[in-house]
Each structure stands twice: as C-alpha cells, then as structure tokens.
C-alpha cells in the first residue's frame, strides 16, 4: 500500500523552507501532494494558478510529488486522494500549540488520518511567506530565501525590490 501524504498550506509564495519540508517528506512517503488550501480570509499576492505553476517549476526535478488546490475540509481531500498523513512543518514551539489543535480536530474528523510534524531546517527557521512579502514590498531582496522562479515573479510584483538587488 502506497504511503501518501498531503502537505497543505497557502504557499503565497512557496519558500525554501517549504521546499526543505517537501524534500524531507519525499524521503518518508511514496507520494507527496503539495496542497494549496484556498483561504478567502487571506488576501493573496499570487493567484492559486500562479502558485501551482511556481511550485511545479521549483519541483520539476522531483519524482513522487504533485501540486493541487482544494477549497474544503482537508481530511476529505486526504481521504479522496487515498492518503493517510497530513504533513506539517514547524518553525517554532509557538506554532506547535495551534498546529496541535488542528491535528486533534482532523483526528476527530477522521481517525484514520495522522498528522506528522517536521521541524524546519535551522537555515529556514526565520523564513515565512509573510515576512518575505513584507521585506520585498519595502525593497528588500528575498534572493536565496525563495526558489528562483518565485524571485523572478516577485520582482514583477514589487518594483521597489528591483532597486535594492
């Protein structure tokens, strides 16, 4: 039986910290689905389609991974895809309490689905999509913190970023 994990997030944009979790997750599971969860409460920099394309390009050389989007209950998606694991990355202990609550709710909704937490690599500990977007908007460069495809797309969105190269 294939071990299928789903790694959900907004990925707006995907960062090298996310890629670290994906690459490590691929060593644990037969298939990893990077799931862009649609969140109407958040205003997004990139459309869902743009995010799918950037993630696919960033992971083009990886086998066993695919990218999808979903607007619904996560456990329903995992079950529909034949998965049994939700993969989550943690940067700090402060994130654990919230993630733990989500994991317990998902477990209550479907007892056959487990949540696996991976600590982000120390190199990416401080990296978040929100911080990267804010720094870029103000002229800072995210080079080295995001895949090259994301860097190029962010240059289009944030003209100030181009001045600081």
Curated annotation (Swiss-Prot):
SUPFAM superfamilies noted in UniProt: Nucleotidylyl transferase
Residues reported to bind substrate: 10, 42, 74, 88
Catalytic EC class: transferase
Primary site of residence: cytoplasm
Pathway(s) of this molecule: Cofactor biosynthesis; coenzyme A biosynthesis; CoA from (R)-pantothenate: step 4/5
UniProt cross-references to CDD domains, sorted A to Z: PPAT
GO function terms (MF aspect): ATP binding; pantetheine-phosphate adenylyltransferase activity
Key words, A-Z: ATP-binding, Coenzyme A biosynthesis, Cytoplasm, Magnesium, Nucleotide-binding, Nucleotidyltransferase, Transferase
Site feature (Transition state stabilizer) residues: 18
Gene Ontology biological-process entries: coenzyme A biosynthetic process
Binding site for ATP: 10-11, 18, 89-91, 99, 124-130
Pfam families reported in the protein's UniProt record: CTP_transf_like
EC numbers on record: 2.7.7.3
Localisation: Cytoplasm
UniProt catalytic activity: (R)-4'-phosphopantetheine + ATP + H(+) = 3'-dephospho-CoA + diphosphate
Domain of life: Bacteria
Cofactor or coenzyme needed: Mg(2+)
Entry GO terms, CC: cytoplasm
Function: Reversibly transfers an adenylyl group from ATP to 4'-phosphopantetheine, yielding dephospho-CoA (dPCoA) and pyrophosphate.
The protein's assembly and partners: Homohexamer.
Matching HAMAP family: PPAT_bact
Family: Belongs to the bacterial CoaD family.
Protein name: Phosphopantetheine adenylyltransferase
Native organism: Syntrophus aciditrophicus (strain SB)
């Amino acid at each position: 039986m294939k071990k299928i994990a789903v790694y959900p997030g907004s990925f707006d944009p995907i960062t090298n910290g996310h890629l670290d979790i994906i690459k490590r997750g691929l060593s644990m599971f037969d298939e990893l689905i990077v799931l862009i969860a649609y969140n109407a409460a958040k205003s997004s920099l990139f459309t869902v389609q743009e995010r799918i394309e950037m993630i696919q390009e960033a992971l083009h050389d990886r086998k066993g991974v695919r990218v999808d989007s979903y607007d619904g209950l996560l456990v329903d998606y995992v079950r529909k895809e034949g998965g049994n694991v939700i993969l989550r990355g943690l940067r700090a202990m402060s994130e654990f309490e919230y993630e733990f609550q989500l994991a317990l709710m998902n477990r209550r909704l479907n007892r056959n689905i487990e949540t696996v937490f991976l600590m982000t690599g120390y190199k990416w500990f401080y990296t978040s999509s929100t911080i990267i977007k804010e720094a870029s908007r103000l002229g800072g460069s995210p080079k080295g913190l995001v895949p090259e495809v994301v860097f190029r797309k962010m240059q289009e969105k944030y003209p100030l970023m181009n001045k600081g190269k």
